[in-house]
Amino acid sequence: MGNTKNIKFVVPGDDPPQIQGSPHLERLVPYGNLTLFSDRPVNLEEQMARAEGAQVIMNTRGAVKWYREALEQLPELKLIATCSIGTDMVDLEAAKELDIMVCNQPGKIAPYVAEHIIGLMFAVAKHASYQTAELKSGRWGLLKNIYLK
């Protein structure tokens, strides 16, 4: 990235908040400037204006998409770091062709995903959606499958 004391870091849309307020942002200060936008860009034009001149883009989840059309307009871009396990918000083929590294966080939230899956399994086994709809309709019938039998 050439001069590592003058890197332009951009967070183009931290919505919902994931990066803003993190004490770890201070660790970037010795290396360059950080621009963080707390809302999502409304269109590609605004997205590109926010990312103009960026060498590093820190993307929160999949809120902001990086298609070939966008990546080709960012000649200085060298890295897209996503705060997610997936990379589906980035055109990986275009990034590779343009020599842009893409990093994600695989496995970082695995315990939470596993916990959520177990919760969903219980919800299906106990017909939680159906039971909720019945209660909201004012019907309080006999509960079936209450003990997972």
Regions found by a protein language model. Name each.
Residues 2-103:
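An N-terminal-biased, well-structured beta-alpha scaffold segment characteristic
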Residues 98, 106-149:
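Phosphate-binding beta-alpha-beta segment of Rossmann-like dinucleotide-binding domains, i.e.
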